[in-house]
């Protein structure tokens, strides 16, 4: 392809809306343009990269025995009402009515549609196991679209669903998809962790996320270098110190005038935060919940939601009037002793192993010292409701955990019979008995994968595409298009590479060499062939985008050299 004919309007300045490297570079390198908040259109180079990633996904899904289909993006409300999810998604789901006032949505996900297909088409155990997948556009009305395609309102996703006769079959399908995902992300040139995760609104269990380590990632990951344990913040656990050597002391009320926060208490009492227990009052649907965690910990609301069995929008911190009603004190002095009315107390599993900690007294301007679980108060539920922190002990081997940030590019989990029960997807077994089909779900964000690749493969000059997903493998840059010899050699190499089936760009624009080199670096094409002054000596220059060194090569050897580089890098 000739650069003079390609729609590639590169930008010199950083767009004001862009905050992270992938967003900045996808705009500067003319991969995409913004149409509306969280909505993007893809230009030729961006489309080629998307197709490259999709092709890798297709090859590995097909290799794993999955079959490609294409479902409708427009989904009738009846299907989601059958599963009970019409209201679960809340305002994130784009809802609309047709001219007959029939409710539809733009698909945020497709569990119900796949299950509906299978309940109508699969009747016997002889038709199972089965894995189907699609690459389709999804729609979610994000409250705050940000970071370009990392969190957008329209995105391309590969979603697959497995259908088996039993859990043993699901385990096999799950492992096939796990291995396929590893191959996909390896081929895309990504460094990633596979972490234990929460299934969220999709339901199911044995949930794993494929996380690309990145400082701009929205997810927090805990992992262990020693044994390989990894989990996202919503699922991460740690070992609790079981050894209690301190004796219980008599509890004592302490006057703490206008001292409300942990930080203020630390300064006022001169005691470290891990000796405090904070009590957070929540409104959970129609109930009031007191959730207790250690003073230096953050409460994990996803863990709390799972314990309560309610949706995210049904849980919120209680307002001042509710806090004052159940504690009898102003905000900042809540504690577990003497709460008024029906309050469910949920205590983090670390607290029963603590001794002589400090809590709010449920009395304005007072706290209580030397409080102990069991002696002074009890809980309705003791469970893990905290976020782990750097240095916590790994739940598997006891080594210190590390904390990092990551970008979720893939998610696999076992749905079981959640949707087959709800929609009546059954099969007849060998004995003639009807049984629910056992399902699994497997998703990859295509656009997000592209952005994650850029996050891991860029420098101050631009993108550094891995060969497997690069829009073109080679860019030829004649330094001076007015020089007949340079033009002739550049065109000859261009034709020879095309003949070999190599994806090649030629920068035939009448621009200064520096501008061309800058664009080549910005676009991130893996191999640059520079045709310059040494052309009369039969020499051109080959430079790989991933490093600074250039190599002089005989013109007669260029094609073979390029073929070998591509073979090595693919």
Curated annotation (Swiss-Prot):
EC top class, as a word: ligase
Keyword Protein biosynthesis listed: yes
Entry annotated with the keyword Nucleotide-binding: yes
Pfam families (UniProt xref): HGTP_anticodon (PF03129), tRNA-synt_2b (PF00587), tRNA_edit (PF04073)
Entries under SUPFAM superfamilies matching the protein: Class II aaRS ABD-related (SSF52954), Class II aaRS and biotin synthetases (SSF55681), YbaK/ProRS associated domain (SSF55826)
Coarse class of the protein's main subcellular location: cytoplasm
Task performed by this protein: Catalyzes the attachment of proline to tRNA(Pro) in a two-step reaction: proline is first activated by ATP to form Pro-AMP and then transferred to the acceptor end of tRNA(Pro). As ProRS can inadvertently accommodate and process non-cognate amino acids such as alanine and cysteine, to avoid such errors it has two additional distinct editing activities against alanine. One activity is designated as 'pretransfer' editing and involves the tRNA(Pro)-independent hydrolysis of activated Ala-AMP.
Xref: PANTHER family: MITOCHONDRIAL RIBOSOME PROTEIN L39/PROLYL-TRNA LIGASE FAMILY MEMBER, PROLINE--TRNA LIGASE
The protein's name in its UniProt record: Proline--tRNA ligase
């Amino acid at each position: 392809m000739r650069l003079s004919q390609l729609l590639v309007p590169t930008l010199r300045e950083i767009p004001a809306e862009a905050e992270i490297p992938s967003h900045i570079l996808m705009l500067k390198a003319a991969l995409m343009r913004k149409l509306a908040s969280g909505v993007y259109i893809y230009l030729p180079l961006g489309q080629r990269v998307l197709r490259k990633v999709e092709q890798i996904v297709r090859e590995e899904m097909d290799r794993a025995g999955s079959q490609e289909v294409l479902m409708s993006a427009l989904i009738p409300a009846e299907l989601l009402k059958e599963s009970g999810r019409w209201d679960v998604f809340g305002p994130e789901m784009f809802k609309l009515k047709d001219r007959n006032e029939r409710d539809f949505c733009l698909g945020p996900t497709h569990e119900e549609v796949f299950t509906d297909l299978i309940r109508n088409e699969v009747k016997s155990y002889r038709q199972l196991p089965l894995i189907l997948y699609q690459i389709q556009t999804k729609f979610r009305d994000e409250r705050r679209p940000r970071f370009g395609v990392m969190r957008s309102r329209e995105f391309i996703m590969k979603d697959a669903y497995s259908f088996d006769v039993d859990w043993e079959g699901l385990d096999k399908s799950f492992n096939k998809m796990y291995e396929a995902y590893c191959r996909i992300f390896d081929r895309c040139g990504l460094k990633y962790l596979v972490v234990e995760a929460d299934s969220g609104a999709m339901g199911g269990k044995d949930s794993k996320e494929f996380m690309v380590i990145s400082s701009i990632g929205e997810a927090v990951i805990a992992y262990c270098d020693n044994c390989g344990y990894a989990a996202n913040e919503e699922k991460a656990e740690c070992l609790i110190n079981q050894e209690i050597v301190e004796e219980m002391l008599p509890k004592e009320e302490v006057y703490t005038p206008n001292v409300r926060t942990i930080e203020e208490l630390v300064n006022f009492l001169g005691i470290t935060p891990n000796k405090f227990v904070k009590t957070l009052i929540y409104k959970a649907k129609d109930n009031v919940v007191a959730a207790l965690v250690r003073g230096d910990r953050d409460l994990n609301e996803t863990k709390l939601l799972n314990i309560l069995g309610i949706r995210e929008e049904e849980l919120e911190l209680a307002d001042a009037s509710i806090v004052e009603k159940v504690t009898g004190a102003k905000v900042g002095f809540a504690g577990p002793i003497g709460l008024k009315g029906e309050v469910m107390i949920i205590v983090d599993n670390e607290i029963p192993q603590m001794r002589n900690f400090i809590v709010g007294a449920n009395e304005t301007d007072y706290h209580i010292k030397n409080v102990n679980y069991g002696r002074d108060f009890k809980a309705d539920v003791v469970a893990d409701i905290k976020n782990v922190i750097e240095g916590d002990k790994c739940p598997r081997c006891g080594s210190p955990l590390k904390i990092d940030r990551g970008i979720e590019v893939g998610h696999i989990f076992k749905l079981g019979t959640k949707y087959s029960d709800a929609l009546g997807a059954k099969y007849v077994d060998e004995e003639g008995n009807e049984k629910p089909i056992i399902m699994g779900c497997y998703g990859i964000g295509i656009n997000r994968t592209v952005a994650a690749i850029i996050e891991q493969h860029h420098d101050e000059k631009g993108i550094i595409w891995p060969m497997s997903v690069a829009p073109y493998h080679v860019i030829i840059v004649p330094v001076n298009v007015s020089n007949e010899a340079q033009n002739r050699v550049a065109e000859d190499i261009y034709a020879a590479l095309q003949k070999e089936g190599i994806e090649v760009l030629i920068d035939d624009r009448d621009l200064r060499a520096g501008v061309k080199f800058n664009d080549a670096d910005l676009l991130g094409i893996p191999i640059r062939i520079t045709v310059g002054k040494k052309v009369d000596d039969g020499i051109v220059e080959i430079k790989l985008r991933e490093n600074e060194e250039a190599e002089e090569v005989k013109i007669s050897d260029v094609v073979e050299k390029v073929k070998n580089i591509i073979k090595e890098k693919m």
